[in-house]
């Protein structure tokens, strides 16, 4: 009897812990709303990419997001960052995605994961590893056996890294995106039948599910591109949509006549190209649109809330028929509410003042800026002549110029 009493006491002691764990992890889409812990909870998110910020600053930037009134952080996952060579994975230092997610959870924030496999993001090759182009029979972003073999390996490996951080297991990850703006690709690749596009999109969603991702899934596209981008079983969200009526109309069309309604990319700034003017977006207009969303039960994700820096050779490029190739800057400041250096901007204050009027939780003050250092004058000394060094290397001879990929050169420079 005494033994049974001890067991009963232990069970009673454990039950509150289990209940806390379950309530802590509860996030669902129900009755046209997002629910967290049984309560309707708008997702007020900001996009911040772990790889564009030194890991020593992650917590500070997350605290700045909280100080703005946000409750969620969204991030892309960059496949080529983590698999620089086939089968060789790296999740250390600034690439430690799990640590970034844990830090967000410690700061009381929800996390939205956007693993692609294609991510755009003005990132080199849209996040695809360069070596995919050397795989025989490979056709990227298609219902192609070789391509899907590698996407499965990536998604499975990603799950091993962050799967236990889903809210279904007590972690902060509440949503995962399927593919990325796929409707844009469908619109551009009319040479591929729509049914094949949809088959590929569905297979990426299935790979996420098969790996073990079991939080709500979603897609993100321009509202006029849902036909190609939406996929059954995933919440369709709109990018850059300011018209509330149109947002609700198109989401209803592809989501059983109900929400929740979310703008997965709400642009408080814009990207920058070399040799072009730096784009600037006014604070007052962004504040008004933020209030409009809050008044109409529309969740949103600021893309970007803090841009950071394209380190190394990670910056990508766009293409414009009038300008040809448009390489992105090393800076990914994005004219975001939090500057590249991690400082408060007038846009930050304007958004914070709006959000504070609508949320029921206390919005903390923004943390103090990180201290800066004064760098003394640096005298450069010639060590070697780069071109002279290159000329001493054994050349590769070919009848026609070879690509970097053909030379197994992922990044850097090639002298032709």
Task: State where each predicted segment sits.
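Carbohydrate-binding surfaces of carbohydrate-active enzymes
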Residues: 148-162, 169-178, 183-184, 188, ...
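N-terminal carbohydrate-binding accessory modules
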Residues: 20-72, 102
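Conserved residues at the C-terminal ends of beta-strands
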Residues: 47-49, 76, 179, 306
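Aromatic- and acidic-residue-enriched carbohydrate-binding clefts of CAZyme catalytic domains
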Residues: 39, 76-88, 93, 121-146, ...
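Aromatic-lined substrate-binding rim segments of carbohydrate-active enzymes
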Residues: 58-126, 130-131, 205-210
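Substrate-binding/catalytic cleft of secreted carbohydrate-active enzymes
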Residues: 113, 117-150, 156-302
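Soluble non-cytosolic domains of exported or imported proteins
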Residues: 56, 91, 95, 145-149, ...
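Bacterial Sec-dependent N-terminal signal peptides
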Residues: 1-23
